[in-house]
A protein has these predicted regions:
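Conserved N-terminal catalytic/coupling substructures associated with nucleotide/phosphate chemistry
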Residues: 1-114
C-alpha cells in the first residue's frame, strides 16, 4: 500500500477504517463481500473521509491483527483466510487485510449472506 493508492481513495475493492471497530460486523460485511466478489483490501489506520493516515501504536498493532484474524475465523463460513500484514505508510503503521476472491462461494457471515 502506497500513499498514492491511499490518495486515490476508496473503491469497490478498497476500504479504509480509521480504527478497529469494537464490533467486527462493521468490517465483516466487507470481508464476506470481497470473498464473494473479486477480492479486496481493508486498510485499518486510514480515515475513510479525509484519507489521512493515522496509523497505530506499535505496542497495540499485533493485538489488533490477532483480533481481526479471530473475528474473521469466528464469523465466516466457509472459512476465509485473509492475508493480514503491517505496512508503513507516510511513517505510520497501518494494518492491511487482503481478502482474495473466494473459491468456495457463497461465503456468509454466520447468520447472514452478504453478496
Amino acid at each position: 500500500m502506497t500513499i498514492e493508492e491511499i490518495l486515490a481513495g476508496e473503491s469497490k475493492n478498497v476500504e479504509f477504517k480509521e480504527n478497529l471497530p469494537e464490533k467486527s460486523i462493521k468490517y465483516m460485511k466487507s470481508v464476506v463481500a470481497f470473498a464473494n466478489g473479486t477480492g479486496g483490501k481493508i486498510i485499518f489506520g486510514t480515515a475513510d473521509k479525509t484519507r489521512e493516515v493515522v496509523g497505530f501504536d506499535k505496542e497495540d498493532v499485533f493485538k489488533k491483527m490477532d483480533a481481526i484474524a479471530n473475528a474473521v475465523s469466528d464469523s465466516c463460513e466457509p472459512a476465509i483466510i485473509p492475508d493480514i500484514t503491517l505496512q508503513t505508510v507516510d511513517g505510520k503503521t497501518v494494518i492491511v487485510v487482503e481478502v482474495s476472491e473466494g473459491r468456495q462461494r457463497p461465503y456468509y457471515k454466520i447468520g447472514r449472506a452478504h453478496v
